Amino acid sequence: MSTAKLDFVRAYEKEVQNKWESDKQFEIDALDAPDAEHPKYLATFPYPYMNGRLHVGHVFTITKAEFMCQFQRLMGKRVLFPFAFHCTGMPIKACADKLKKEIEQFGCPPVFPVIEEKPIQEVTTAVKEDPLSFKSKKTKAVAKSGGAVYQWKIMQSLGISDEEIPMFADSAYWLNYFPPHCESDLKLLGVGVDWRRSFITTDVNGYYDSFVRWQFESLKALGKVKYGKRYSIWSTIDDQQCADHERAQGEGVGPQNYTLIKLEVVEPIPECLKEIHSQGKKIYLVPGTLRPETMYGQTNCWILPTGKYGAFEMANGDIFVCTERSARNMSYQQMTTGKGEYKCLAKFEGSDILGAALKAPLAINPIVYVLPMLTIDENKGTGVVTSVPSDSPDDYASLQDLKAKAPLRAKFSIKDEWVLPFEVVPIIDIPGYSNESAVRAYKDLGIKSQNDRALLDQAKDLCYQKGFNDGVMSVGPYAGRKVSEVKKIIKDEMVASGQAVDYSEPTSKVVSRSGDECVVALSDQWYINYGDDDIEWKNQTIKQLESMEFYSAETKKKFEIALGWMNQWACSRSFGLGTHLPWDEKFLIESLSDSTIYMAFYTVAHLLQGDVNGSKPGSAGITPKQMTSACWDYVLMGKPYPEGCEVSEEKLKELKKEFTYWYPVDIRVSGADLIQNHLTFFLYTHAAIFEKKFQPKSIRANGFVNLNGEKMSKSTGNFLTLVDSVAKFSADGTRVALADAGDSIEDANFVDQTAVTSLLKLHTQIQWVQETLDSIDKFRSGPLDRIQDTIFESEINNIIVESEKAYQKTNFRDALHLVFFDLQNARDHYKVTTLDQMHKDLVLRFIEVQALLIYPIAPHFAQKLFNMLGKGNILSAGWPKAGAIDYEALKKNNYVQQTIYNFRMKLQVYQKAKLKGKPAGTKAIPDQSTIIVSKSYPKWQQDVLEYLATIYNEDSKSFTKDNNAIAEELLSREEMKPHKKNLMGFVASAIQNVKESGKDALQTSLSFDETSTLTDNIDYICKTLELTSFDVKDFNEIPQASQSKIQPIPGKPQFQFV
């Protein structure tokens, strides 16, 4: 297949990029003072991790920042878009070590055993979380392929030769290899970055290292960094915390804290536990619960009959009956005799302990029994579940099943006395709802059994939310007090008295990049004190949200939720790549904690470092050691010039000028998955360190991007790197497809065919412009005196206005459709309506305006058009000024277009009926076509529209009454009763029209005459519809007998064919 068009487009793209490079188009420095006419604009994007080439998933987010930057440049702003390369943490080290082990084990190049490799698949947890918490449930396992496949093969999949792969066994090689590729790939896409300010992270770069050390010294001085025992996701292989970016599976997963209730096994002892009991040891079943305050209502304990259980000895001699998986977690939480060590005294199936008698703490029932539950997940909690049927729909459903089904009891040899005597025990009263919330929800939702999973999940959320927010204890020492007040008190008392213990585990499966399934460990570590323990800091950060722009209500809501649950965050690790804690050098700062305010480092990086690695000083002539924390305080905090400083104040002033000019961040663009960690840390740390004027102004979040409707996956081959995309579709073809992929916080979709089509359209448009310019003197000139001129000029000006709004809101897909598709449709319409007699000035205006409007999305194409027009650098032109807009002419034009569309649809119906049974090729052109218009609505419809106008709120763009209230009001009117059948259908149609067109849709008449508008366009309409002529008649002019069959209304004529 010929690649001529692709080659043509890529050739001019390269020319444009070379010109940008030679002109240093995107390099920009601070001014001595702000320029009100040309304000600064700083955009940043989370630096990507340097363990592979960039793919369209990365670039989908990058282009949101890129589009905004190019738009702001056109708006006359001085824009800085810097970019850096993240290398901190375990991923690079883990991959390098893995590769080294493969070479040692299998040779170089390695000869691997022939086995089926099964890469980890992307998963979404099906297990219910605490309804009161907010956790990400999606992981990106496929693209990371932690311990699932050989590292050598992963490197091959990145296009690296077998000769070079061994170099990557040294983690330092990664830091030198991928950053240059990342830069060159983005240059291929035409991204407008000031590359002088780029840097790599870790202590390899002494300048960045000194910056991060200063950051943590500042946080510690402010009391934000503390030391103590904390729960965190832990890699047992690496023997340290496993942060999000160090995971092959489970990104976003955090610890889930449970209370393990100690249900003591009493006589008669099950056979499988008798030997242990004979040794005088106390044996406990240990269900994990999120609701310790409900333990008063225990009626039984659930186990999975086919589940694999063990009796594990704890450090204090207690024996816990649970799954081995949970015992493994306990061994990292100082509950067993040694870290990672757990002694199993017996193994058995759940069926072996059915019917065991238990003494349950707090329970009103003195003895409860072990019963079967078939829906227990052995990979969640301890595999043991306590039963509180008053407030847990799952428990109530399972208990009802056992009570109602004798065969089910017989199947598991369950005695009646273990089940039938036990009734629901009311323990929590929810005013206005029930004191047995699970029973009420079970009945209200029509749940039939424990297998009604979706309904039970719904009921569980309902009961948990109502119980926590509105519930009042009705039993125990705290009767009469709200659940939300006493939940923690009851839990703490149970732990203190030895009736329960704290326990934590990952909310879902986490696999480290070293290949092990992670646990939750309780360990001494440095942590950042996010959350309720520093409520002043938390409230300060929450207050920031009020003054920020988030571009969508959903994004802001996610921040509110994240700030609600965010808690202390472990910020140290034992090894990997990164910066050492200044006051405790044996620890490194983890990868999400060293990347919260690095945007400030961009402002001075080009002066400090002479290259991306910081291996030599930059123009300021300052060494890393000279950049002490006191220097950073002067530059970034406005503190006095430090005594005995090795750097002159003049040099530090130059750094300070850059920082104070560029800060704060005007827009931070990121994937929405980072709201739950990085972006919230970003807000917290800015609030702690910087004064109010340097707080971020806006955050723009987006979802993941799919590829051709499917999740991107190397294992399935549905994967596209940036360099491959540019090679296949060109830079602008890729950019247009990325803009068209979607704008919301939900997942978007990059479509190959869109990229191909975009490439072809760009090529076609270049050809059209060239042909047009070659014959421009043949176009009509003189005054713009035709209605078609007015319409086209107004459409151009209106698109200038509307596309500016779309860009400002970061609605880039809307902007694309306006400036590329709608604008070209307007040109094509102008060409047809003028019968190929377009005006020279308007055609040239169209070409220039389209180039300017599409520049943020397709800058190479735009600059090419400007070159063809002989106008030089497109950025010098700035955003086009919109001239006068004749809205009345646009209304008429839209009316004509809609009428043509409706006419064609109606004509097709007529022709289909006429051609039924006729030979192929027969035509059914009507002898006479009539368009019937009406200047007014029927009286009852006028009344409806006038009423709706009175209850429409312009500010909120909504109606102040709902449909039920509207119906009640209108149906109470005597004159509406004859129209009862059609009334609400008309109301619904009117409301929909308002949503699409605004309050104007409620006007009872048009601002223009339909008859004259149609007759003025008769030639165009006939040509478009292939008619010889048509008539226009007023509704009142047609015979009364025909009026009942049709009902035109203003703006929506009807049609007749004879």
From Swiss-Prot:
Top-rank taxon, per record: Eukaryota
Pfam short name (any one): tRNA-synt_1
Extent of motif 'HIGH' region: 48-58
Residues noted as binding ATP in the record, renumbered to the chain: K714
Reaction catalysis annotation: tRNA(Leu) + L-leucine + ATP = L-leucyl-tRNA(Leu) + AMP + diphosphate
Catalytic activity, EC: 6.1.1.4
GO aspect biological process, one term: leucyl-tRNA aminoacylation
UniProt subcellular location: Cytoplasm
Annotated InterPro entries: aa-tRNA-synth_I_CS, aa-tRNA-synth_Ia, Leu-tRNA-synth_Ia_arc/euk, M/V/L/I-tRNA-synth_anticd-bd, Methionyl/Leucyl_tRNA_Synth, RBD_LARS1, Rossmann-like_a/b/a_fold, tRNAsynth_Ia_anticodon-bd
GO molecular function, a single term: leucine-tRNA ligase activity
Short sequence motif named 'KMSKS' region, residue ranges: 711-715
The family this protein is said to belong to: Belongs to the class-I aminoacyl-tRNA synthetase family.
Name listed for the protein in its UniProt record: Leucine--tRNA ligase, cytoplasmic
Source organism per UniProt: Dictyostelium discoideum
